[in-house]
Amino acid sequence: MLATKVCFVTVGATASFEELVRAALDPSFVTALEENGYSHLLVQYGKNAVIYENFLKQYPPERRPWRRINISGFSFHEHGLGGDFALAQADISKGRSGGLVISHAGSGTILEVLRMGIPLIVVPNPSLQDNHQEELARQLQKQGYVVASHYQNLCQALHQAEQLRARMLRWPPVRGPDQKNQPTLEQVMSDEMGFVD
């Protein structure tokens, strides 16, 4: 059985972001996902249900040109998106290879995805006033944490996200608040060899 590889797209629950939903469901982007080994595209479309429903009418499962990718969507989950983000997280025991999250540039979403160690494409919503999302996305990309993109450039951003994944593998492991602090190499050597400060 092949491992699943999930691309999860989220627009958040408060503001409409039609352009990102359209771009994520664009045939060229779905094809790019399939070509990069993705098995699932999950779209949290928020207030943009009409766009998703129109996609389903235009591309019912039996008439889709994509045979190796499952496409599904939902409006929002009251319990949050942590479980959906986890679907894009590599977990060999669950048959998942590392996927990707594409998100509006909400700071809460960005922090949660970064904590989970999942490659992230951040797409600021240009319709928001006082667009702090653009500045946040640019700074995080400049520091090498995310891929900042415009919704019209998702195919190119997908390629950049795969490069980001390779760089992330060299990062130290992410420690969540529920994990014990592991001793540093210095602490282990001190304990084993009797070094005293």
Curated annotation (Swiss-Prot):
Q: What is its main location?
A: endoplasmic reticulum
Q: Which GO terms describe its cellular component?
A: endoplasmic reticulum
The Enzyme Commission number assigned here is 2.4.1.141
Keyword Chloroplast appears in the UniProt entry:
no
Keyword Endoplasmic reticulum among UniProt keywords: yes
**Known catalysed reaction(s)?**
an N-acetyl-alpha-D-glucosaminyl-diphospho-di-trans,poly-cis-dolichol + UDP-N-acetyl-alpha-D-glucosamine = an N,N'-diacetylchitobiosyl-diphospho-di-trans,poly-cis-dolichol + UDP + H(+)
One GO BP annotation is:
dolichol-linked oligosaccharide biosynthetic process
Q: What class of enzyme is it?
A: transferase
* Cited Gene3D superfamilies: Glycogen Phosphorylase B (3.40.50.2000)
| Keywords from the UniProt entry | Endoplasmic reticulum, Glycosyltransferase, Transferase
A GO molecular function assigned to this protein is: N-acetylglucosaminyldiphosphodolichol N-acetylglucosaminyltransferase activity
| Location relative to the cell | Endoplasmic reticulum
* Chain spans, region Disordered: 174-197
Entry-linked Pfam families: Glyco_tran_28_C (PF04101)
Supply the InterPro entries for this chain.
Alg13-like (IPR039042), Glyco_trans_28_C (IPR007235)
Top-level taxon: Eukaryota
Q: What interactions and quaternary structure are annotated?
A: Heterodimer with alg14 to form a functional enzyme.
This chain's function reads: Involved in protein N-glycosylation. Essential for the second step of the dolichol-linked oligosaccharide pathway.
The similarity annotation says: Belongs to the glycosyltransferase 28 family.
State what protein this is by name: UDP-N-acetylglucosamine transferase subunit alg13
As recorded in Swiss-Prot or TrEMBL, the protein's gene is named alg13
